[in-house]
């Protein structure tokens, strides 16, 4: 015979698991919340691989980056407010413009969006 307390504990555990699951939201890839997650991953990647980015920039001197990204890389505080307002097409251009986008950045961005319960949909 199962004790009522065991059933109650099981129900409580299931309820806690449901409550802990992040809410999901589907957004346009150009939504500023998506851009901020992408830029956060990008800034973290630059910090972790700074020499590689310097070499890439030296080899591609015409590639320009928004000044806000450079400020965020070297400001180790909360940089998300610095990155608001960068146009979505500029975010896409700088992030996808590096050779390691598909091998390193895209998986990290997908993971970060998923962790935040954000999924993207291409607008019709």
From Swiss-Prot:
InterPro entries: SRP1_TIP1, Yeast_SRP1/TIP1_CWP
Pfam families cross-referenced by the UniProt entry: SRP1_TIP1
Major location (coarse): membrane
Keywords of the record: Membrane, Transmembrane, Transmembrane helix
Domain of life of the source: Eukaryota
One GO process term, biological-process aspect: fungal-type cell wall organization
Molecular functions per Gene Ontology: structural constituent of cell wall
Membrane-traversing stretches: 7-24
Disulfide bonds: none
GO cellular component: fungal-type cell wall; membrane
Membrane topology: Single-pass membrane protein
Annotated localization: Membrane
Keyword Membrane attributed: yes
Family: Belongs to the SRP1/TIP1 family. Seripauperin subfamily.
Protein name per Swiss-Prot or TrEMBL: Seripauperin-3
Organism from which the protein derives: Saccharomyces cerevisiae (strain ATCC 204508 / S288c) (Baker's yeast)
């Amino acid at each position: 015979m199962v004790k009522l307390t065991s059933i109650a504990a099981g129900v409580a555990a299931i309820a806690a698991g449901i409550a802990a699951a992040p809410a999901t939201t589907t957004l346009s890839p150009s939504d500023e919340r998506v851009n901020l997650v992408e830029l956060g991953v990008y800034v973290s990647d630059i910090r972790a691989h700074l020499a590689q980015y310097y070499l890439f920039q030296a080899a591609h001197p015409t590639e320009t980056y928004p000044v806000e990204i450079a400020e965020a890389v070297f400001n180790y505080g909360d940089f998300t407010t610095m990155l608001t307002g960068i146009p979505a097409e500029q975010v896409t251009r700088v992030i996808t413009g590096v050779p390691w986008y598909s091998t390193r950045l895209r998986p990290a961005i997908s993971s970060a969006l998923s962790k935040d319960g954000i999924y993207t949909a291409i607008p019709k």
